[in-house]
């Protein structure tokens, strides 16, 4: 089993999120990468599209920390189980939620990503409730 700190996903979460390095997005993601579960189908792909999400999230939260609990790596795929913690800027509430990310690696960069994060749990921690559609 690979050392977690040697994996691309660990580097991604550490550089991009924990060290708040927007330039690392260009370094670690291809120009045409998709990011399911994060980017809408009509948003730009790749680093430029991800930067939209990155900056929107950073505008709403600060002191963002992503702990990489485990990484499984096989061939050109990596999958990570993570815990995100942050402070909601508007309310000052501390939040924490779990998530998983799987990526396909192309030439040493993220070429495609599938994300599954507990955004419902995040919204509940902020006091938001889902209402039925009428």
Short names for language-model regions:
Residues 59, 63, 86-96:
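Short, cysteine-centered beta-strand-loop-beta hairpins and adjacent loop/turn segments enriched
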Residues 100, 115-116:
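Residue-level structural signal for beta-strand termini and adjacent loop
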Residues 75-84:
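A short hydrophobic beta-strand element
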């Amino acid at each position: 089993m690979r050392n977690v700190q040697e994996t691309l996903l660990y580097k991604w979460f550490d550089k991009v999120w924990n060290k708040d390095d927007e330039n690392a997005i260009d370094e670690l993601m291809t120009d045409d990468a998709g990011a399911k579960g994060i980017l809408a189908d009509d948003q730009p792909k790749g680093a430029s599209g991800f930067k939209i999400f990155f900056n929107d999230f950073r505008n709403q939260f600060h002191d963002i920390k992503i702990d990489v609990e485990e990484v499984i790596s096989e061939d050109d795929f990596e999958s990570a189980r993570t815990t995100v913690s942050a402070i909601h800027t508007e309310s000052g509430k501390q939040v924490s939620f779990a998530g998983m990310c799987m990526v396909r690696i192309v030439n040493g960069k993220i070429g495609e990503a599938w994300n599954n994060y507990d955004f419902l749990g995040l919204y509940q921690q902020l006091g938001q409730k889902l209402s039925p559609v009428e």
